[in-house]
Amino acid sequence: MTEDTSMQSTLNATLPETDMPLAEKEAAVEKQEYRNAMARLGSAVNIITTDGPGGRAGFTASAVCSVTDTPPTLLVCLNRSASVHPAFIQNQVLCVNTLADSHESLSNLFGGKTPMEQRFDAAEWTDLATGSPILTNALVSFDCKVTQITRVGTHDIMFCEVVALRCNDDCHGLAYFDRRYHPLMRQIAC
């Protein structure tokens, strides 16, 4: 038995078994209490984009994080009831465009009910390997192929292997904390 198989067996043995779907379990914490607490967890602001057979689509997200650097993989969480969900599932590619401090209004466009064409018309885009839209002046863009999707509650967690990236050294970052945007100033090396 390999170390990975042994570890998985140990994890499976220690996790409680249940036939009840996660969404039907009684919550130990109230939904609003949880949301209020999560608002205190600051994060980068991202516009997630895709293009392909399912169409061109994009949405604003803060539920993005690194998974591993070998292979370079990140995750993106997407509500299955979101209007853009079918496009992302069908295309199986996406780009995580991490926003600069000048992108607050663009974040609001992609986070609302603005028609998709108007969202994309508000900025300049290019593409790299997958054909997903790359925001030309993003702080960083991670061009990805979706390698795995896991359902948890109301959301799909998309695990995405980074196949290309692009960094911009000429801007500062944008964070979302306590339901407000905050600029993040980069340290300039001498």
From Swiss-Prot:
Q: Which reaction does it catalyse?
A: FMNH2 + NAD(+) = FMN + NADH + 2 H(+)
Reported EC number(s) for this entry are 1.5.1.42
Which major enzyme category is it?
A: oxidoreductase
Keywords of the record, alphabetical order, are: Flavoprotein, FMN, NAD, Oxidoreductase
Q: Which Pfam families match?
A: Flavin_Reduct
Keyword NAD recorded:
yes
Q: Which InterPro entries match?
A: Flavin_Rdtase-like_dom, NADH-dep_flavin_reductase, RutF, Split_barrel_FMN-bd
Q: What Gene Ontology molecular function terms does this protein carry? A: FMN binding; FMN reductase (NADH) activity; FMN reductase [NAD(P)H] activity; riboflavin reductase (NADPH) activity
Q: Name one GO biological process term.
A: uracil catabolic process
Would you identify the family this protein belongs to, as annotated? Belongs to the non-flavoprotein flavin reductase family. RutF subfamily.
Q: What does this protein do?
A: Catalyzes the reduction of FMN to FMNH2 which is used to reduce pyrimidine by RutA via the Rut pathway.
The record ties this protein, via HAMAP family, to: RutF (MF_00833)
Q: Which PANTHER family match?
A: FLAVIN REDUCTASE (PTHR30466), FMN REDUCTASE (NADH) RUTF (PTHR30466:SF1)
* Protein name, as recorded: FMN reductase (NADH) RutF
- Organism, by scientific name, is Pantoea ananatis (strain LMG 20103)
Q: What is the lineage of its organism?
A: Bacteria, Pseudomonadati, Pseudomonadota, Gammaproteobacteria, Enterobacterales
